[in-house]
């Protein structure tokens, strides 16, 4: 999740995603209703308040990463240092240290059981995997700069905005 690691580096990190879908649709299959979410994510940023904080800046803001949970190198720019996260979550035991890192979006789409709220499917890193394989020069690129390879990796990656649900006959 760095836009300064000089490449396509899809990996698992100890980060939780705030799904925050921009689009939700419903469908019914075999009498059961499901919700589909496009998990974009979005920071709250208003006059007088912004929750957005890069991982490397937690310590400067007075809430360092818990050294019992995270190796200090995780805050390096080539690791998670540039990842934009929320400053409002993560101190689980109220000791002033961040125990969990929460980033915006899940970079995927998910299917949820509408009755129980349980997640029944998540596409995982497929958007990034497919782009890396088919259009590597556009991997996590922005939509407003022609030469922006990897420019969105520290934000929300492929940033799924919308979805449609249909029937195949």
Give the residues covered by each predicted segment.
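Beta-sheet-rich non-transmembrane sensory/scaffold domains
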Residues: 1-169
């Amino acid at each position: 999740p760095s836009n300064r690691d000089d490449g396509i580096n899809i990996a698992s990190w100890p980060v939780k995603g705030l799904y925050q879908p921009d689009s939700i649709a419903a469908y019914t299959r075999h009498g059961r209703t499901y919700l589909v979410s496009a998990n974009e994510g979005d920071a709250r940023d208003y006059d007088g308040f912004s929750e957005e904080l890069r991982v490397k800046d937690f310590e400067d803001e007075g809430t360092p990463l818990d050294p019992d949970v995270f190796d200090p190198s995780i805050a390096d720019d080539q690791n998670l240092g540039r990842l934009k996260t929320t400053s409002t979550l993560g101190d689980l035991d109220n000791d002033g240290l961040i125990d969990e890192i929460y980033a915006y979006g899940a970079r995927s789409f998910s299917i949820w059981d509408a009755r129980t709220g349980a997640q029944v499917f998540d596409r995982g890193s497929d958007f990034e995997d497919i782009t890396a394989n088919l259009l590597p020069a556009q991997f996590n690129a922005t939509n407003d700069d022609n030469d922006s390879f990897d420019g969105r990796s520290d934000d929300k990656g492929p940033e799924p905005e919308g979805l449609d649900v249909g029937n195949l006959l």
